[in-house]
């Protein structure tokens, strides 16, 4: 549990924005919501909102890296998003190709590591190839780990992990008594990352939409009113300040 600093005058700051460097969340997850509404408000096609949302990803990735966040997980496309119009889905599927083509050199320079969670089944081969290329090029980087949740759903992830655990127990002749949280975590797509300390959702909606439903059990939640294309570095820092003003209890009692 993070402790509040008793002497604010001695609090060290980060990035010249009054952030306590001893209380930077290790893992920030973001539900990037509001691209369509952003475009609609401007009487533009929805794909324009997705394009501008991609530009926001670049800004937030740079800022997260500069601040010292270790893991940034972005909800890019859910298992439920396939129900959207085909033209919109096709455009979204091509975004990783364009994003990585233009941004990968900078990510490499900033020592950012690219990873993904989700299911490859159903993704276009061009999308898979772009993702795999970026992963290979950044696999040894040691700075920010940028995780894209693509064709991801929390329930589907848990179902997959349960099947894998069942098969493992069958193979080893073990019973259900060996199942614990650690075993489940080892079979989740996020097994190599810490659970998110902070989960942000933009657009003002207050739900998690099947995102990291196991991992976010003790996350701090912030629901930001900005639509994703309007979410910027200042908004991210404000969210971090709110996070730092809270005391995480993990089911325990406040120290006050």
From Swiss-Prot:
Q: How is the cofactor bound?
A: Binds 2 magnesium ions per subunit.
Q: Name one GO biological process term.
A: polyprenol biosynthetic process
Instruction: Write the Enzyme Commission number(s) for this entry.
Output: 2.5.1.-
Complexes and interactors? Homodimer.
UniProt lists the family membership as follows: Belongs to the UPP synthase family.
Tell me which NCBIfam families the record gives: PRK14830.1, uppS
Q: A Gene Ontology molecular-function term?
A: manganese ion binding
Q: Which UniProt keywords apply?
A: Magnesium, Metal-binding, Transferase
Tell me the gene name: uppS
List required co-factors.
Mg(2+)
Taxonomic source organism: Staphylococcus epidermidis (strain ATCC 35984 / DSM 28319 / BCRC 17069 / CCUG 31568 / BM 3577 / RP62A)
Functionally, this protein is described as follows:
Catalyzes the condensation of isopentenyl diphosphate (IPP) with allylic pyrophosphates generating different type of terpenoids.
| Binding, Mg(2+) | 33, 220
- Tell me which InterPro entries the record gives: UPP_synth-like, UPP_synth-like_CS, UPP_synth-like_sf
Give disulfide pairs as residue numbers: none
According to the UniProt record, one GO cellular component term is:
cytosol
> CDD domains, alphabetically?
Cis_IPPS
Q: What start-end ranges are recorded for coiled-coil regions in this protein?
A: none
Binding sites annotated in the UniProt record for substrate:
34-38, 46, 50, 78-80, 82, 84, 201, 207-209
The organism's taxonomy opens as:
Bacteria, Bacillati, Bacillota, Bacilli, Bacillales
Designated name of the protein: Isoprenyl transferase
Query: Kinase among the record's keywords?
Result: no
Active site, UniProt feature: 33, 81 (proton acceptor)
Gene3D superfamilies recorded? Decaprenyl diphosphate synthase-like
